[in-house]
C-alpha cells in the first residue's frame, strides 16, 4: 500500500514515520516519552466525534472549522514531539502533553478561541484523546 499525498507531505514536513504498510496506527515521535507513542484509528475516531470541527458534543473543546483529519493528526504529532509532558492528575497513569501553537487551533469548552492542545497518552503509548483547551 502506497502512502497518500497528504501522508507523504505530513512525513516530509514533520519528519515523522509510519508503520510500513499500516496507517491505522500512526507512530508519533516524542522527545519526552519513554517509548513509542501511537495514534490508532479508533482514538482518531473518538477525537473527531467529540472534538472535531463538526462535533456537537457538549462540554468539550473543539478543533477549528475547516481543520481536516490530517491537520489534526499533525497538531497531535507536534504536541507529542514538542509539548510539555507531565503526569496525569488524580493518580491516573496517563501522560499529558500540552502544547501552545502560534495561532488558534480551536475553541475551549467555554467556546473561546485557543492556541493550546492537550494530548492524553496511556502508559502503553496509545493516544487516548486530544483536544483544544
Language model segments and positions:
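Functional cores of ribonucleases/endoribonucleases
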Residues: 28-133
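Bacterial N-terminal signal peptides
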Residues: 7-17
Amino acid at each position: 500500500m502506497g502512502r497518500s499525498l497528504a501522508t507523504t507531505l505530513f512525513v516530509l514536513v514533520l519528519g515523522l514515520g509510519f508503520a510500513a504498510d499500516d496507517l491505522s496506527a500512526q507512530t508519533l515521535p516524542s522527545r519526552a516519552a519513554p517509548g513509542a507513542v501511537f495514534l490508532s484509528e479508533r482514538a482518531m475516531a473518538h477525537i473527531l466525534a467529540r472534538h472535531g470541527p463538526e462535533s456537537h458534543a457538549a462540554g468539550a473543546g473543539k478543533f477549528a472549522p475547516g481543520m481536516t483529519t490530517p491537520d489534526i493528526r499533525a497538531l497531535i504529532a507536534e504536541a507529542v514531539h514538542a509539548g510539555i509532558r507531565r503526569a496525569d492528575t488524580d493518580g491516573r497513569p496517563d501522560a499529558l502533553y500540552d502544547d501552545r501553537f502560534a495561532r488558534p487551533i480551536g475553541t475551549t469548552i467555554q467556546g473561546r478561541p485557543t492556541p493550546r492542545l492537550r494530548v492524553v497518552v496511556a502508559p502503553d503509548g496509545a493516544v487516548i484523546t486530544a483536544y483544544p483547551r
